[in-house]
Amino acid sequence: MGKKYIESAKLVDKNTLYAPDEAVDLVVKTSKAKFDETVELAVRLGVDPRHADQQVRGVVILPNGTGKKVRVLVFAKGDKAKEAEAAGADYVGAEELATKIQSENWFDFDVVVATPDMMGVVGRLGRVLGPKGLMPNPKSGTVTFDVAKALTEIKAGKVEYRVDKTAIVHVPVGKSSFGAEKLKQNFHALMDAIVKAKPASAKGQYVKSVALSSTMGPGIKINPVKVLD
């Protein structure tokens, strides 16, 4: 354990469930690394992800962005390819990009957007893009003819969240350099979206536990009841 981590851990009471804003203040205070740490949110939900009707996923545009430069690859042709380039896509192409991904194991991008007519090409990449969470999806707005809008939202700080096999949602809230106020705004936007995405078939307590942490900092537990206030 590093000295800085031990110092940071002293500021956090492991047995306390903090109010959300108090937790954000603490996460900023405990971010002591030399680099700009990412602040992560982990929410354990009262759902059974094995059932299709209890999947929790969605997208939310963070009011203050993620602080991360997002590299976007767009599968499009003709005018839509030009539109993507004009809107700031990092890579634009069709079959040749699919071949590059398959043959070179190339993944220098964070998000993939595709026009619907390109899904025949993109579909072949399901096995490699799927496990990395990179497969375009109409629900998350990444399969669309409106590529300019999709790109603008992604670059502005749109994040996708989804529950994993253990019923936990892991999602970035921003960077520690944002300061407490901006992180609080992002945190509340994320929690509102996750709460609204509650499946109708979910029984009992929906938000079971909530925790915040920076990349190198200790976990800070949040009172799940206070999140719903």
Swiss-Prot record:
InterPro entries: Ribosom_uL1_bac-type, Ribosomal_uL1, Ribosomal_uL1-like, Ribosomal_uL1/biogenesis, Ribosomal_uL1_3-a/b-sand, Ribosomal_uL1_CS
Repressor keyword on record: yes
Any Pfam family matching the protein: Ribosomal_L1
GO MF annotations, alphabetized: rRNA binding; structural constituent of ribosome; tRNA binding
Family matches, as CDD domains: Ribosomal_L1
GO CC terms: large ribosomal subunit
Biological processes per GO annotation: regulation of translation; translation
Entry keywords, A to Z: Repressor, Ribonucleoprotein, Ribosomal protein, RNA-binding, rRNA-binding, Translation regulation, tRNA-binding
Family listed: Belongs to the universal ribosomal protein uL1 family.
Known partners and oligomeric status: Part of the 50S ribosomal subunit.
Function in brief: Binds directly to 23S rRNA. The L1 stalk is quite mobile in the ribosome, and is involved in E site tRNA release. Protein L1 is also a translational repressor protein, it controls the translation of the L11 operon by binding to its mRNA.
Stated name of the protein: Large ribosomal subunit protein uL1
